[in-house]
Amino acid sequence: MLPIVDTHQHLWDLSQFTLPWLESDGVEMLRKDHLMRDYLETSANANVARTVYMEVDVAPADRLAEAQFVTELCRRDDNPMAGAVIGGRPGEVGFREYISQFKNNHFIKGVRQVLHVPDTAPGYILNADFVKGVQYLGELDMIFDLCLRPGELADAVGLVNQCPETYFILDHCGNADPNIINGDVPHDPENPVSHSKEQWQDDMSTLGEHEQVICK
């Protein structure tokens, strides 16, 4: 079997940090620890050679604890975790100081902020402070994971254009709705997470023209 690199590994230990979104409706089954031993058991027959941890939107006060949690896992030789993308908010005051503390931690590969949430308005990632924060990631040789509403992929294009020295990972193929892409469900302009097939295709094509953008 071909060795697999799992580039989007979610783990959490609720005794070490809090995930506010676990209180949302519909995620009751996730309200428990998901630890490395659980992952190893589940993936035992998948030939996973390496993994990259993906941040889990912890409470802001727990971001450092999350980074410490995954750094320790990366240091150990009893699991395949080789690197981590941690939580952070490039547009916030203090982001530069926060992320700078990891510049000599070779396990920390980059940052993600979940952007498809109600309190993040369209166009947010084009704010000057956000752009500067993402540009600084490039200076540190770190990447930024893009995880936003599919109808706002044009904003991602605008951000990428302003950050030529930063590499980007576009998560979940831009969060497209496969039912819309397949033509089974129409675009609903009143739904903030809806999109049209043509808009998604056009924006994905534009993002694909940038060498510093990788899609997964």
Residue ranges and their predicted role:
Residues 23-31, 55-60, 85-91, 117-125, ...:
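Active-site mouth loops of central-metabolism enzymes
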Residues 3-6, 49-52, 81-85, 108-112, ...:
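Structural preference for beta-strand elements that scaffold enzyme active sites
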Residues 10, 56-57, 86-91, 113-117, ...:
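Active-site beta-loop-alpha junctions enriched in small/polar residues
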Residues 33-36, 64-67, 92-96, 127, ...:
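Structural motif corresponding to alpha-helix initiation and N-cap regions
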Residues 123-216:
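Catalytic pocket-lining loop regions of alpha/beta-barrel enzymes
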Residues 14-20, 66, 96-98, 123-124, ...:
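Short aromatic-enriched loop/helix-cap "lid" or pocket-rim segments at secondary-structure transitions
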Residues 1-71:
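An N-terminally biased module of ancient metal coordination in phosphate/nucleic-acid-related enzymes
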Residues 39-47, 68-80, 97-109, 126-139, ...:
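Acidic (Asp/Glu)-rich catalytic clusters
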